[in-house]
């Protein structure tokens, strides 16, 4: 290897090392700013940026605790994914079993042999926190409660929720011969992140304050009071029973940024809500709206053209892209061009030739199409020969 090549390789390694150090330092600064705040009154809390996976604050977030009704988030996630993947239909009819009709706790009072669609039961599950709806959906998807619980634990493993064990589809307190569901605040945040990514349709349900059931004979009311007391909150799920304390997995959006906050084993619902509001507010204060690219901006001025009357062409960003980012990381966004290298003629102006991706710490945070700045006419035989032997 020649000296110049060695120097280039060494320079590349040093640049990557410096970038890693900068990212680590900036992340540390964020952690320190949160650490200076007082500890929360809840046993376990976490604040997550779901776009990047960054943990902005955590307190005892890796201790498995009873989630109570927050266990229903996994039930809803599995059912909605089955709908999205075509394994079941949202309009499929679910017949209520005898076991479902006898369940206690929060419910919509399903009666044996009654029939409801999956959509209706998902609404009951996420708005009223209906235990009977949770079990009815579990039986319909897997044939039995036990089969569905196995599925819940399989999904947990896929999502790398290593501090989670489910024993029920609803999170009710265990009977004497049963074990409690256990999940950490960190794992609930991972589940919320998966819901936002894979089944965002659930936000249409979790964001509803109330909704009718049985054609209006029963009005379901959401237990998540953050929906009306914290601007931008549109989910996800509360939970409570005596041994579990008060808990919530919340998400909110502000100026294009979204955060997830989890609080578990809080002494009262008021303290729970106050702690989560404080976490979300401090988190959003770190964000700013950043323009990554203008619509029509030149991304490359000389992308090579094969088989054309010209040898190169400019490519443009199709859309303006703005994202909300935590201020320390805004300058670390990288641009990556996929495609347009080369461009095959003939091609029309504004036709797509690739994608411009914006990447932060290895994760894509936004993208837009790349389009041609001009018409590309087909060239003569010489241009075609150049295309065959390399541009």
Kindly label every feature range from the protein language model:
Residues 5-21:
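Bacterial N-terminal signal peptides that target proteins for export
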Residues 13-14, 26, 33-35:
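Serine/proline-rich low-complexity intrinsically disordered segments, especially terminal tails, linkers
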Residues 20-29:
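Bacterial N-terminal signal peptides
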Residues 34-200:
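Active-site-adjacent loops and short helices of periplasmic peptidoglycan-processing enzymes
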Residues 165, 179-391:
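Domain-terminus/edge residues, biased toward the C-terminal soluble/receptor-binding domains
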């Amino acid at each position: 290897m020649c000296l110049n090549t060695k120097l280039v390789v060494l320079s590349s390694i040093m640049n990557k090392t410096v970038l890693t150090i900068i990212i680590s330092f900036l992340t540390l600064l964020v952690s320190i700013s949160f650490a200076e705040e007082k500890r929360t009154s809840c046993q376990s809390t976490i604040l997550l940026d779901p776009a990047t996976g960054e943990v902005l604050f955590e307190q005892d977030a890796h201790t498995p605790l009873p989630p109570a009704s927050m266990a229903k988030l996994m039930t809803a996630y599995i059912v909605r994914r089955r709908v999205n993947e075509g394994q079941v239909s949202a309009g499929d009819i679910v017949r209520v079993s005898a076991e479902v009709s006898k369940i206690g706790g929060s419910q919509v009072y399903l009666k044996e042999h009654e029939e409801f669609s999956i959509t209706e039961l998902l609404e009951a599950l996420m708005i009223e926190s209906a235990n009977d709806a949770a079990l009815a959906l579990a039986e319909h998807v897997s044939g039995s409660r036990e089969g569905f619980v196995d599925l819940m634990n399989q999904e947990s493993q896929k999502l790398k929720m290593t501090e989670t064990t489910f024993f029920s589809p609803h999170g009710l307190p265990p009977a004497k011969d049963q074990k409690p569901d256990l999940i950490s605040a960190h794992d609930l945040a991972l589940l919320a992140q998966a819901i936002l990514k894979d089944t965002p349709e659930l936000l249409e349900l979790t964001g509803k304050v109330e909704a009718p059931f049985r054609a209006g004979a029963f009005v379901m009311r959401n237990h998540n009071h953050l929906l009306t007391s914290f601007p931008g909150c549109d989910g996800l799920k509360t939970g409570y029973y005596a041994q579990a304390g008060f808990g919530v997995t919340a998400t909110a959006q502000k100026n294009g940024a979204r955060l997830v906050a989890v609080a578990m084993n809080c002494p009262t619902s008021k303290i729970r809500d106050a702690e989560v509001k404080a976490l979300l507010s401090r988190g959003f204060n770190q964000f700013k709206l950043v323009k990554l690219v203008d619509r029509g901006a030149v991304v490359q001025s000389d992308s090579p053209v094969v088989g054309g009357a010209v040898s190169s062409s400019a490519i443009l960003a199709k859309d303006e892209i703005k994202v909300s980012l935590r201020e320390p990381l805004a300058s670390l966004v990288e641009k990556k061009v996929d495609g347009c290298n080369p461009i095959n003629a003939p091609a029309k102006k504004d036709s797509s030739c690739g994608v411009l991706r914006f990447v932060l710490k290895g994760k894509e945070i936004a993208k837009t199409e790349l389009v041609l700045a001009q018409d590309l006419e087909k060239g003569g035989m010489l241009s075609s020969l150049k295309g065959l032997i390399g541009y």
